[in-house]
Amino acid sequence: MKKLTVYLATTNPHKVEEIKMIAPEWMEILPSPEKIEVVEDGETFLENSVKKAVVYGKKLKHPVMADDSGLVIYSLGGFPGVMSARFMEEHSYKEKMRTILKMLEGKDRRAAFVCSATFFDPVENTLISVEDRVEGRIANEIRGTGGFGYDPFFIPDGYDKTFGEIPHLKEKISHRSKAFRKLFSVLEKILESENR
C-alpha cells in the first residue's frame, strides 16, 4: 500500500504526538504547516471535527485529519462537553479541574472522554468521520502529572488511577486513541479497495 501523508488540523503538540504513536505504518502524520483559525461553534464534537477537517483541507489542498474531543460529565448535563477547552479559557487546567470538583460535590461522578475524528481529502472529496469514547469517573482530587488537559482527574473504567497517573496506558485506551484507530481501520479498507 502506498504511504499516505496526512496533516493534522491542530497546533497542539500533545495531540500530534499522541496520534503519531498509534498511526499505522502506511500513514505519515505531519503537523499542519500553518495555524488556521476555525471557529468551533458546532453543538457536537462531530460537527466541530468535520468543520476543522474541511477548513484545513480546503486551505492546505491536502488530506487532513481533525478531531474534537472533550469531557462529558453526566450529572452536569454533559458539561463541559464541546466547551471543554473553552471553559474558563483564560485559566489553567488545574483551575478548571478545581472548579469542576466543586461543582461535583455531592453529585454522581460518572463521566466520559469523547472524541470525534474526521479524515478529509479535498482532492478526492472524501469525508469520513467516526466517534468513540472511554467511560470512567471524576476522581475526588487532581492526581498525576502525565498527559494533558483533564487527564489528572479522570479515572477510566477498570482502573483506579487517573490518566495523569498512567500516561503510558492512555495511548492504548484513550478516547482519541480509540477513535483514530477506528478511523485508520476504515481508511485502510477504503485504500485497499481502491488499490485492487
From Swiss-Prot:
- Pfam families (alphabetical): Ham1p_like (PF01725)
- The set of disulfide-linked cysteines is none
| Gene Ontology CC terms | cytoplasm; cytosol
Against InterPro entries, the record matches this protein to: dITP/XTP_pyrophosphatase, ITPase-like_fam, RdgB/HAM1
Top enzyme class, one word, equals hydrolase
Q: Tell me which UniProt keywords the record has, alphabetically.
A: Hydrolase, Magnesium, Metal-binding, Nucleotide metabolism, Nucleotide-binding
What are its cofactors? Mg(2+)
Q: Does the keyword Nucleotide-binding apply?
A: yes
Please name the catalytic residues of this protein.
68
Biological process terms from the Gene Ontology for this record are: nucleoside triphosphate catabolic process; nucleotide metabolic process; purine nucleoside triphosphate catabolic process
- Residues involved in Mg(2+) binding: 68
Give one GO molecular function term.
ribonucleoside triphosphate phosphatase activity
Instruction: Summarize where substrate binds, as residue positions.
Output: 10-15, 69, 148-151, 175-176
Q: What is its EC number?
A: 3.6.1.66
Give me the comment on cofactor binding.
Binds 1 Mg(2+) ion per subunit.
Q: Does the keyword Heme apply?
A: no
UniProt record similarity statement: Belongs to the HAM1 NTPase family.
Subunit record text? Homodimer.
Primary role: Pyrophosphatase that catalyzes the hydrolysis of nucleoside triphosphates to their monophosphate derivatives, with a high preference for the non-canonical purine nucleotides XTP (xanthosine triphosphate), dITP (deoxyinosine triphosphate) and ITP. Seems to function as a house-cleaning enzyme that removes non-canonical purine nucleotides from the nucleotide pool, thus preventing their incorporation into DNA/RNA and avoiding chromosomal lesions.
Full protein name: dITP/XTP pyrophosphatase
Species whose genome carries this gene:
Thermotoga maritima (strain ATCC 43589 / DSM 3109 / JCM 10099 / NBRC 100826 / MSB8)
